[in-house]
Structures are given as C-alpha cells and as structure tokens.
Amino acid sequence: MRPEGSLTYRVPERLRQGFCGVGRAAQALVCASAKEGTAFRMEAVQEGAAGVESEQAALGEEAVLLLDDIMAEVEVVAEVEVVAEEEGLVERREEAQRAQQAVPGPGPMTPESALEELLAVQVELEPVNAQARKAFSRQREKMERRRKPHLDRRGAVIQSVPGFWANVIANHPQMSALITDEDEDMLSYMVSLEVEEEKHPVHLCKIMLFFRSNPYFQNKVITKEYLVNITEYRASHSTPIEWYPDYEVEAYRRRHHNSSLNFFNWFSDHNFAGSNKIAEILCKDLWRNPLQYYKRMKPPEEGTETSGDSQLLS
C-alpha cells in the first residue's frame, strides 16, 4: 500500500525501450563519427592545406547530426514527463470519483446550510490541493534534473558548429523579420545562448547571451530576466550594455532612429514596447528545439574554390 499523499508515475514499456534505443543510437553515432573523423583527418594530412576546410565542414556536419540525436533524447524525456503527468492526473481523478461515490450525497438543504456545507468541503479540500501542488513541484524538479545533462551535452556540441545561434535566430520565421544586416553581424559574435526558468517564489525566465570579443560592446555575457504569467512576459532586469566609444554614437542613433520593434531595440533597451514578444520566442521556441531552424551549409566540393558563403541546403 502506498503512503497517503504519494503519487506513482508509471512510464510505459514502449517509451522506456524507445528511450534506451535512442541512447544506443546516439552512442553508436558518436563512435561511427569518431572513426569517420579519424579517417578524414588522415586524408587531410596527405592532401595538405586544401583538405583543412573540407575537414572543418565535415566536423561541423557531424556536430549537427549529433545534435539531432540529442534533441531526440530531450524529446523522449519530455514525452515521458507528459505521460507521467497524465497518468498521475488520471489516477487522482479516479481516486476522487471513488471517494465521491463512497460518500452519500446530502439531503435537501436550505441555502444557508448549503453554504455552510460548501465551506466545510472547501476547508477539507485545501490541504489536498496543497499536497497536489507539492507533488507536482517535486515531479517537475525531477524531470528538470533529467533534462539537464542532455542540455549540457547539447551546448557542448553546439560549440563545434560556428555561428550556430546566429543562423538559428536569423532563420526563425518571426525573428527574421526583426533582424537587420547590422544585427546579423552583431549576432555573428554570439557563441552561446542559455535559458533558465525558476518557478518559485515567482515564475522567472532568464535569458543569457554569450559573446566573444567584438567591435560593438565589451560585455561577455548579457542577461535579461522576465517575470512570466499566464498572458505575458514582463521585463524585470537587464545587464547594461557597455558600448565601445567608437560605436556608442551609432548605437544611440539606431535606438532613436527606428521606433519599431526589432532585435537591436530589444537588445539595447530592455523596456522597449513589444520586447516581451522576442523574449517569449527565445524561451518557449528557440531554446527548446533550435535545430529545427538551423539551415545546414553544403560543404565545398573537392577541386572547387571556397567562397565566403557556402550554399544553403534546402
């Protein structure tokens, strides 16, 4: 018999087998990629400098393929979480129905006595609701701990794909309309994006953008925080941008010349009207599965000259 108040989440056997299968597939892909990379590097040594660019392109493609597998694992974890929550809700609903059937309904009541009875039921219900909230919070924390190693691994692999986040942000259907050529150049110095969510005591979404040295600003990390409720993301805190003197005047001009919502205005002015829209896209869409917006580049063919931009794969 389970202790009173505890919840049991059963993961279906087909999901457990599918998760293990994804793990073995990712492990096999890593081993195969390592063997292919070794053979490719041996050829690169023989062919000289002309083979270096091809090797870099191949390694970047391997990293993107590995990201596919990591995203599959993250999706399996998310699916397990949904199934566990659904099964827990069904179990609690069935228990409530059985309890309701066991208690005889009240007889004819006056409005005054009905309100008194309703108050008594509500008082009894409050500790049950509190217990359910605690159980749900514990389950959510457990699933977040399971997701973390996959997200850490994804971040490490992304480091092997130059310009990954700039590519993803620029190719998002909604973000692309908000990005100028100058924004794209600024984003080309972005090396990583991280999103953290806190549920207690308030729901907070923290966006962290990491940059390498660039001609625009001195910051290595820019953090933006938003309070989240059912209807909106509300600006809470932002790291002040330390513009270089040579660009400070241009930054001021850009910020005041264009009053419409765009990436630069969101980036430079935390309280800009409509900036919560960009925050929501980053937190709820791009962070959860960035690979769906990544446009892969065709590696240069042997014997052809490499141009500044490789051809996009359709």
UniProtKB/Swiss-Prot annotation:
SUPFAM superfamilies: NAP-like (SSF143113)
A GO MF term: histone binding
GO biological process: cell differentiation; gonadal mesoderm development; nucleosome assembly; spermatogenesis
Compartment(s) where it occurs, according to its Swiss-Prot or TrEMBL record: Cytoplasm; Nucleus
Family membership: Belongs to the nucleosome assembly protein (NAP) family.
Assigned keywords, A-Z: Cytoplasm, Developmental protein, Differentiation, Gonadal differentiation, Nucleus, Spermatogenesis
Organism: Homo sapiens (Human)
Protein name per the record: Testis-specific Y-encoded protein 4
Listed InterPro entries: NAP-like_sf (IPR037231), NAP_family (IPR002164)
Role description: May be involved in sperm differentiation and proliferation.
PANTHER family in the record: TESTIS-SPECIFIC Y-ENCODED PROTEIN (PTHR11875)
Short name of any one Pfam family annotated for the protein: NAP
Chief location: cytoplasm
Gene Ontology CC: chromatin; cytoplasm; nucleus
